[in-house]
């Protein structure tokens, strides 16, 4: 059996947000992420679940270098990416993208869809013909029409805007996408469509996802493994079935009790 390829690793990740007191002395305001170890494999979806404020979005941003971690090590394809090495971070980020929670605020309201999709291509310094090819392909992958490229974000529904956000993430051909609660701001009727689209794209393109959410039913549907976060720590980790059928932590069982139809397996 072929060994899985580890694409991203994190060891001992900590993120502390500081504030200064009246005298200007720095003190801890929030210890958002504490001693987290995590591995992500090629073609895998790793689900991060937990209640609001548990640190899952902060952890995701630390892993992608969007937030500077306080402590810990990150490895991309086995090579350490030091937190102060901006060149290495940018090189890693060339292969990473993010899909934001709110499709309304994450798109520039003054740009057309074409301008939104061109923005991440600027660093690649492509020819106009190459840009055009990538834009057409990105629109096709998320089932948006060619005519949509000339429209502004306000002309679209929430689900369509999230498709634009997905196209923006895909256009640079990333290896990893952080899906930061990508369906929580959408109508329930649209959520399944977006999750199915993400699953199809993952299978077609071999993408690796970090999928943060508080909806455990959706996380189970899309994820291969799940990490349960509480107060900045991953308190339980495992494949979907072991987490759902035989949770070890009381906190995990509490989260699962809110899932319709969940019943703890006894014995």
For each feature predicted by the language model, list its residue ranges.
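Helix-to-loop junction immediately C-terminal to a conserved catalytic motif
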Residues: 64
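Conserved ABC transporter NBD signature motif
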Residues: 72-81, 92
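Conserved ABC ATPase "signature" region
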Residues: 129-147, 256-257
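Conserved ABC ATPase signature
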Residues: 152-156, 160
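Conserved catalytic motifs of ABC-family nucleotide-binding domains
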Residues: 173
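ABC ATPase "signature
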Residues: 237-238
């Amino acid at each position: 059996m072929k060994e899985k390829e580890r694409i991203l690793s994190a060891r001992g990740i900590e993120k502390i947000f500081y504030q200064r007191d009246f005298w200007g002395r720095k003190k801890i305001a929030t210890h958002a992420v504490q001693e987290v170890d995590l591995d992500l494999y090629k073609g895998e979806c790793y689900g991060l679940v937990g209640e609001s404020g548990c640190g899952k979005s902060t952890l995701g941003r630390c892993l992608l270098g969007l937030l500077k971690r306080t402590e810990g090590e990150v490895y991309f394809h086995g090579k350490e990416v030091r937190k102060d090495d901006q060149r290495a971070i940018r090189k890693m980020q060339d292969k990473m993208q993010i899909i934001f929670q709110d499709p309304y605020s994450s798109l520039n309201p003054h740009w057309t869809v074409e301008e939104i999709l061109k923005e991440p291509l600027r660093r690649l310094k492509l020819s106009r013909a190459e840009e055009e090819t990538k834009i057409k392909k990105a629109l096709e992958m998320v089932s948006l029409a060619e005519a949509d490229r000339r429209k502004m974000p306000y002309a679209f529904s929430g689900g369509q805007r999230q498709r634009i956000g997905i196209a923006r993430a895909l256009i640079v051909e990333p290896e990893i996408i952080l899906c930061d609660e990508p369906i929580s701001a959408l109508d329930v009727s649209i959520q399944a469509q977006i999750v199915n689209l993400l699953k199809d794209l993952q299978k077609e393109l071999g993408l690796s996802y970090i999928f943060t959410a508080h909806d455990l039913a959706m996380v189970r549907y899309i994820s291969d493994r799940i990490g349960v976060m509480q107060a900045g720590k991953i308190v339980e980790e495992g494949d979907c079935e072991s987490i759902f059928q035989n949770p070890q932590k009381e906190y995990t069982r509490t989260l699962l009790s809110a899932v319709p139809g969940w019943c703890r397996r006894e014995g």
